[in-house]
Amino acid sequence: MSIYHMKVRTITGKDMTLQPFAGKVLMIVNTASKCGFTSQLKQLQELYDTYQQEGLEILGFPCNQFMNQEPGEEADIQEFCETNYGVTFPMFSKVDVNGKNAHPLFVYLTEHAKGMLGTKAIKWNFTKFIVDRNGEIVGRYSPNTNPKELEDDIVKLLEQ
């Protein structure tokens, strides 16, 4: 199964697959509104503003699995992200990224891009996965990695 066949739900409740993003460079991120890394939403939006026309899509998936840092409902999350960080990149409904209820997209991502010491589990909010235009996962980055640090890698993928 390719990543593009994964079923997701937008933050406004629309069911879809990732097929509309085929042929694009993707950065898939588990987000949270009350996290020490929440300010990364600003950098994510800056990357999106700069490179969306060249084929970058940033996909945000709110997650409440880490210290209850995303307790709100989807409408609250969307309003927070838009009001405080000007987020216009696609946001999706809240998901689990680990455990028996983990969303199939994150099961797929963690099976194909392991973390430190070969672990599958996502350790915290704002773990980032980069997917190339062919749907191959080419990188997994920790929450400590600022999105802007990935700009050179993104540009190289966009140029392919």
UniProtKB/Swiss-Prot annotation:
PROSITE patterns: GLUTATHIONE_PEROXID_1, GLUTATHIONE_PEROXID_2, GLUTATHIONE_PEROXID_3. It is an enzyme of class 1 (oxidoreductase). The lineage of its organism: Bacteria, Bacillati, Bacillota, Bacilli, Bacillales. The active site is at 35. The keyword Translocase does not apply. It comes from Bacillus subtilis (strain 168). Its EC number is 1.-.-.-. Keywords: Oxidoreductase, Peroxidase. This is Glutathione peroxidase homolog BsaA. InterPro entries: Glutathione_peroxidase (IPR000889), GPX_AS (IPR029759), GPX_CS (IPR029760), Thioredoxin-like_sf (IPR036249). It holds the Pfam family GSHPx. One of its GO terms (biological process) is cellular response to oxidative stress. Transmembrane segments: none annotated. GO terms for molecular function: peroxidase activity. The keyword Oxidoreductase applies. Belongs to the glutathione peroxidase family. CDD domains: GSH_Peroxidase.
